[in-house]
Amino acid sequence: MKFKKTIIDRARLGVAWRNFTASLRQDLANDFLRPMVPESWRNAVRKKSSPSPTRTSVRKEKPVVFVSYATDESLKGSHRYCGGEKLLNNLVLLLRRHGYEAFMVSLDGKHADWLAEHAPFLSIEEFKIRSARAGDVRFVSSWVKARPFLDECPRFYFWDQELSASSRSHFPDLAALMANHRIIRTAGVNRAVQAFHRCIFETEALAVRQLIDDVHWKPDPSRRIPNRVGYFDEGDHGAAYVRRIAELTKAAGLSLEFVQLSGVEREIITQMQQCGVFMALNIGKSHLWGEGGPMSPQEAMACGTVPVCYDINGPWELIQQDYNGVIARESTPEAMAEALISIYSVPGRLEEMSLRTLEIFTTSHSMEARWPEVSRFLDLPLK
């Protein structure tokens, strides 16, 4: 453990040193060298400099996009209930719906059959052949340890969805890739991840938030059971939290049914459509900054199910407090029960919040609403 920490600390020092020397050179140029250059010369240089091409310029052919997190035999590039895979899969689906050839890549070309709609998969060998034939390509990954894939990519786009990895065990690899200019552009899955990259690497990282496939995630009012509260198994704390929340809401005079959602994506969608409220029990991988999500509150919104969650990074970008959901004041069962009581104890409030959550999702958080972020990230035309 000490050895691993030493490697991470040395990588962080390396990044800090490179940023310091770059800043020193810039200060030297701005404060010492630039005043020595006559203004007339500087104006001449500005006039001769041609503007860089814009991202909306017309391309002769659409690029082919390859997306992967394939790492090794234990992480082949597809396994059940991997939220990161779902986001990458939905990225490929969005690209294909906009007319691009786009593929997921796993070691053997196979995928675990669990999503409502799987994007086409290629094996590493098929990917090598197709990428060699393609004229214009984009390589995308969310996992800097994906060596079988990234070793075949001269440069790639990095969509960081897991700060607990990027800031810790993956940091030396990430720092080396940044230093060697292997990463064309970085995007964070929320503002916290974006800010990390901007601060540490002084790069213009973008934000590409979760992609929820609203072709499949959509409301069905006929299935709604208003007093049903759904939740996922989020770890060892979950069962005790649910028991305590049930006790407190019952003591407040509410008769709520708490149902654990489980199964493959199509089954989860049906179960989510039945819930009046979804409570996200995820307390994050760090008590300070969480993990940047999770996706489930946004999936709930797509179904018109009111999300209630803890304050881990991400929900504040989805939820207007007490308008289309509630972010509990702290990560305790008491705070979650308090949020549920605030919704169910006021007649008509659940129905109002349900309409608002669906409206906000449709206008601001649908897959299509994310296209401007995605196209900017991958240097693609907006239209």
Range-by-range predicted roles:
Residues 232, 321-322, 326-333, 342-347:
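Conserved acidic donor-binding segment of nucleotide-sugar-dependent glycosyltransferases
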Residues 9-134, 311-315, 327-329:
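N-terminal pre-catalytic "stem/leader" segment of glycosyltransferase-like enzymes
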Residues 80, 84-93, 195-268:
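Conserved catalytic-core segment of nucleotide-activated headgroup transferases in glycan assembly
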Residues 348-381:
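A charged, aromatic-enriched C-terminal amphipathic alpha-helix characteristic of glycosyltransferases
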Residues 301, 306-309:
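Short hydrophobic beta-strand element within catalytic cores of glycosyltransferases
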Residues 273-288, 305:
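Acidic donor-binding loop of glycosyltransferase active sites
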Residues 281-297, 312, 316-317:
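Nucleotide-sugar-dependent
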